Amino acid sequence: MPVVVQKVLLAEPRGFCAGVEMAIKALTWMTRVFPPPVYCYHQIVHNASVVAAFEAAGVIFVDDIEAVPSGARVMLSAHGSSPEVGAAARERTAVVVDAVCPLVTKVHHEVRRMAAEGYDILYVGHEGHDEAVGTIAEAPRAVTLIEPQRG
């Protein structure tokens, strides 16, 4: 027998996932330990007030790891990064804190494993989103991005 839902209530405010909470704590630690600027590869969270507070504390958010000066301190966001971005960060910076969410790390591991076993992988996500970019980069020949339908 189908269930009819008449009303859905959304909690306000909704909190961040555990991975983002961990990344926020890590970036807060970096702003306390290191003098500004501290760099963060991509915005730590899709929340303007949190990003603004970190910018006020001396964090510079970049969308290209090459924009981080040599010898700087950088955090990789909770959404995950491609292996190439992680390698470039470790090569050019003094300190790298990889704050990728453990659940994103698990997805990356599973994508690599399944690709190595010969599977074709369908990844449902949004083109250009940090999580999708990082995940697809783990096995680009094996992963096909599927954009969810809106509406």
Stretches with model-predicted labels:
Residues M1-G151:
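The feature marks the mature, well-folded catalytic cores of soluble enzymes
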